[in-house]
Amino acid sequence: MQPTGPCNVNPDALPPARGYSHATVAGDTVWIGGQIGSDETGKVLEPGDIVAQYARAIRNVAIALRAAGFTPEDTVKLTYYVTDMRAYRGSRGGLGAAYREFFRSDYPASTLVEVRSLVDPDALIEIDAVAVHRP
């Protein structure tokens, strides 16, 4: 396979990208920029509900993956940024159910990081991802 240069992907189903790209593809790899629980206009849905925001954020990751020609099954790494670790831990059942909508087996590596705040003050969680086409 011939190497290809980076290609940015910004699907219409995600908020307009200003100063960043939702996904960057280079060769067999895609990097998904941080996705929050927002609709296609950028409005955060369900302020205060980490499970609902997680479900939307992971859906947004899947939208970016598919727009770039990948699937959730191609994901090799997820990074979660949360503003309240206690809320995250207390919601693991609901978070797990939303997670399994996209990742049913072969769970990717992941990292969970607590941060002071995210780009939108109503955002409770942000997810970025890396995916590689599997042979």
Report residues per predicted region:
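N-terminal presequence-like segments and the immediate start of the first folded domain
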Residues: M1-R59, I63-V76, V82-P135
